[in-house]
From Swiss-Prot:
This is Phosphate import ATP-binding protein PstB 2. Its EC number is 7.3.2.1. GO terms for cellular component: plasma membrane. Residues 31-272 form the ABC transporter domain. It is an enzyme of class 7 (translocase). Keywords: ATP-binding, Cell inner membrane, Cell membrane, Membrane, Nucleotide-binding, Phosphate transport, Translocase, Transport. InterPro entries: AAA+_ATPase, ABC_transporter-like_ATP-bd, ABC_transporter-like_CS, P-loop_NTPase, PstB-like. One of its GO terms (molecular function) is ATP binding. Its main location: membrane. Gene3D superfamilies: P-loop containing nucleotide triphosphate hydrolases.
Amino acid sequence: MQHESPTHGMNMSALRRHKQRLDLADETVAIEVPGLNLFYGDKQALFDIALNIPKQKVTSFIGPSGCGKSTLLRSFNRMNDLVDGCRIEGAINLYGHNIYTKGEEVAELRRRVGMVFQKPNPFPKTIYENVVYGLRIQGINKKRVLDEAVEWALKAAALWDEVKDRLHESALGLSGGQQQRLVIARTIAVEPEVLLLDEPCSALDPISTLKVEELIYELKSKYTIVIVTHNMQQAARVSDYTAFMYMGKLVEFGDTDTLFTNPAKKQTEDYITGRYG
């Protein structure tokens, strides 16, 4: 009996998509993008994106400004729904389930797929109330449960020792780096499965950046992490896999060491060596 290859009968576009995706067993894929196009009104922002995001690894998106990195990231928890005129063609599967299915509970999706933005955005509340905010929304108000969640989340975010004696002080009194780690604590307090980080260190000093990078390394044992960064050195330091994007297209995707030391595409090499971008 003849066995056809997985690519038999594919057109060239589909074949290119197949080759870009990592060959991972189903149980090791957190997010599968089999072929995504995204539009803002009449303008197409993402073109035929296909990739698999590995579970409990750090995947970074790199590329010049405006290449679609953040747009792709925000599609993973449907933040783009908030932009007028945004529509997609295709699917994004979170552990095998298409998150763009009609009737999808978007609030629950955003609990499962948490997001940390470029600029730290603590609420004008106490440190304690920042961490428990999402839990209270879920109807959890028992003090013992909240206390345990605060300690656990702040320890996981490497912030507990710095703030444990000031939990009932305003979060706005923290440094920028502390605020960003607090936001991460707030995000993981509701026990997501995926963390999306949109340039989380761009507003931080080098010491704070190092602490956040160390935190990312610690968190990947429990969470799937996807990070957008303009800092290629940061991508090389913290990520297991890297995707290079240009003008809304996925140029190359693979393990970080290989992509940075032996890229398959000249366009990737030109970008990481500073020839453009």
